[in-house]
Amino acid sequence: PQWFAAIDRPVGDDQDKFGKTIRERAMNSIDKMVEWTPKTGRNRLYSMIEARPDWVLSRQRAWGVPMTCFTKTGAKPTDQDFLLRNGEVNARIAAAFESEGADAWYAEGAKNRFLDGIVDPEAYDQVFDIFDVWFDSGSTHAFVLRDRDDGSEDGMADLYLEGTDQHRGWFHSSLLQSCGTRGHAPYRGVLTH
């Protein structure tokens, strides 16, 4: 299956100052939080967010950032137990990535390594899809500005600066991801050249 971020479904995380859905949060952030230089940048990104469909997060390629999840064998995506949600499994994956990098996901025996002793590895399929590169790029705000001694206190960038092509790319993906995880834009200003 493909993996989507539903941008019109309520996020349900109590970060509703700018709206309940990713789309509402993004459009309100564009209007109420961000200074646009030039001003036409606001209209460009706003119209893209206003008209966009749900975000397809997955890609079927041999390289990229793996999605690192397991699905129940034979289950449908609509089944409650389709996706394995287990903190101990997630901790094993995170530890492997910290010590070995993303290639740990593709190593021989990875499924057993991550699942054995917690759940029956035979009951789950390892997902080999990767994230859309714009999802990967859009996550930079979380690692550059948050959870670091030299990051900003509120985790927001003062300015994103790129060419106008990034309205469809980095500005767009950063906005959607931050609105989904933090409730608002990751930047105070956007300047395009």
List the model feature ranges, each with a label.
Residues P1-H193:
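Structured secondary-structure scaffolds
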